[in-house]
């Protein structure tokens, strides 16, 4: 029994190391593609890629799903990156003094996209789910790193706002990713 546990742990560590290495390489490629050099941008996009990998892995239940997961990952990758970027567009629009505007640092843009695509467009659902994962990762990273949302009083409410909205971004269209036409999370 102890040998089986050690073998399982070794396999888990190797899998994690390979996945993390892959995430670093993909992150570097995405940053190069969009000409990004900021350390903050690199952090946000790496966290987004790692969360996207975990999100897809958790949804790939059957062997057929596992084979399809690679395609879903690459299809959702660029929208995921856009999700990691979107909250910081408030800097461009309102300057740094308006950064962490609650409209940009929320799930509002995600649910607007969900509403616009409807429930029947599986391809678009994959893109929007990727965006939602990227947005969720940005919001959750801000909980750990900054957490100061404009116009909300105190650090606890700010972090609660970011955390809840990050969670909401992982709902909706992703419930049917990598699954047949059935429903459920």
Identify the meaning behind each predicted range.
Residues 1-185:
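N-terminal membrane-targeting hydrophobic helices
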């Amino acid at each position: 029994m102890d040998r089986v546990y050690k073998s399982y742990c070794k396999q888990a560590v190797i899998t994690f190391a390979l996945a993390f290495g892959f995430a670093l390489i993909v992150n570097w490629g995405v940053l190069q593609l969009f000409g990004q050099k900021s350390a903050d941008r690199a952090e946000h996009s790496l966290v987004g890629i790692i969360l996207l990998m975990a999100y897809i892995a958790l949804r790939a239940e059957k062997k057929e799903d596992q084979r399809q997961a690679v395609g879903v990952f690459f299809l959702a990758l660029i929208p995921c990156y856009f999700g990691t970027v979107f909250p910081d567009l408030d800097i461009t629009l309102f300057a740094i003094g308006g950064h962490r505007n609650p409209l940009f640092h929320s799930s509002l843009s995600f649910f607007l996209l969900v509403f616009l695509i409807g429930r029947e467009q599986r391809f678009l659902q994959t893109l929007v789910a990727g965006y939602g994962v990227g947005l969720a990762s940005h919001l959750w990273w801000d909980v750990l790193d900054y957490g100061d949302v404009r116009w909300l009083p105190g650090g606890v409410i700010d972090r609660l706002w970011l955390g809840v909205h990050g969670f909401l971004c992982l709902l909706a269209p992703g419930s049917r990713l990598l699954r047949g036409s059935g429903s459920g999370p």
